[in-house]
């Protein structure tokens, strides 16, 4: 599943004849809620050939790099959906993965805010029967509640 397909799925925008967001709008939401980060990985098997990071559904357009604490790179096959790296040889030191992480809750929150504040999108959302359960204020409150707490607002 591509990033755009996943974004459409979490925003309930899967009707191809009546799409609420264009591909470029969704791509912009994904890129503004993404960051390149180095995260520690934990071994997932006893042979230490499969390593897990605490993120799922990574951005597959960015080539992930796996290395140890001495910055020795390892040949690895990355599963971007599961957030795992399968190494060809077991390392002797802790492993880190440099990857592009998408904060999907923030993508969803931004998308819901765009729906609530744009009458065209709100009407399209209403046509599919998804807005009948809550009003705009509830939708905005829900988007605030799912947003990740990062950084400091000044």
Task: State where each predicted segment sits.
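Conserved short "hinge" loops at termini or chain/domain junctions
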Residues: 1-104, 114, 145-154
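Charged low-complexity stretches with an acidic bias
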Residues: 72, 121-152
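Amphipathic protein-protein interaction modules
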Residues: 102-134
